[in-house]
Design a protein with these regions (language model features):
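Short alpha-helical elements
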Residues: 1-250
Length: 250
């Protein structure tokens, strides 16, 4: 029992207002079911191996799948991550290896959504924007062979107001810099060597960019995040957002 994850009263109170109303047959206890889902994602378990204390494993899986499809976890993350205005933003991307159970559809001729083969292994790519404290504000998923620019283009329209945005030289593009400036955000991005006119940037400020890398490290401590087992991209990104909610927002 001591090894089981269990939502506290305060944690449950922060997310419960976003739960869908139950209709018809009463659903399983929200605290235990959500705690069980978190336990499975963090430990990297198969659903059928979930501890019995959380209830039937099918209940855990069905709740996770149904609420992922309905966007419940996405709404919780979006609401909690947008309650204040960050002074600083950081953007980056990381690869997440796809387990054979997630990639197996490719062998049947139906390629799984958001899984690609950039260099050998099949994987997905997580694009993220975090604040100056290393807390994720925006998350999106693409196939592993997608460029950083694709992720930036997907996230840029949703950037919250901020003073600065830090990014590595992979994000050095005129369109991205111009978009940030239009939003009142100052880009702190080292220029590429082949840029005709080099652009100055705040090197002292840029040293803080490790926060986004640390954020990815904490997410990958969750085994079902570090390795993708979910065939459907909407359930995998839901798992990532659940991890982000638990680690930073409740």
């Amino acid at each position: 029992m001591t090894d089981l994850y269990y939502l506290t009263d305060d944690q449950l109170a922060r997310i419960q207002p976003f739960f869908p109303l139950a209709h018809g047959v009463p659903r399983g206890d929200d605290r235990w079911v959500i705690s069980g889902i978190i336990h499975v994602l963090k430990r990297g378990l198969q659903w059928r191996d979930a501890p019995r204390e959380y209830g039937p494993h099918k209940t855990l899986y069905n709740r996770f799948k149904r609420w992922s499809e309905r966007g419940v976890f996405d709404r919780i993350f979006t609401e909690l991550a947008s309650r204040d205005v960050p002074d600083q933003l950081q953007i980056d991307a990381t690869h997440l290896k796809a387990h054979r159970t997630a990639a197996s559809l490719a062998k049947k001729g139906i390629f799984p959504a958001n899984i690609g083969r950039p260099k050998g292994e099949l994987n997905s790519k997580l694009h993220a924007v975090c604040d100056g404290e290393g807390r994720p504000r925006l998350l999106c998923l693409t196939s592993g062979n997608a460029s950083d620019f694709k992720g930036a283009a997907m996230l840029a329209p949703h950037l919250p107001p901020s003073r600065d945005l830090l990014a590595d030289k992979g994000y050095d593009a005129n369109w991205f810099r111009e978009d940030l400036i239009k939003r009142g955000i100052s880009p702190c991005i080292p220029p590429k060597r082949n840029r005709r006119q080099q652009i100055a940037y705040d090197k002292a400020l840029y040293r803080l960019r490790h926060k986004v890398e640390n954020m990815f490290g904490k997410l990958k401590d969750w085994r079902r995040i570090a390795t993708r087992y979910d065939r459907c991209s909407h359930t995998f990104i839901a798992a990532i957002k659940i991890a982000a909610i638990v680690i930073w927002w409740i």
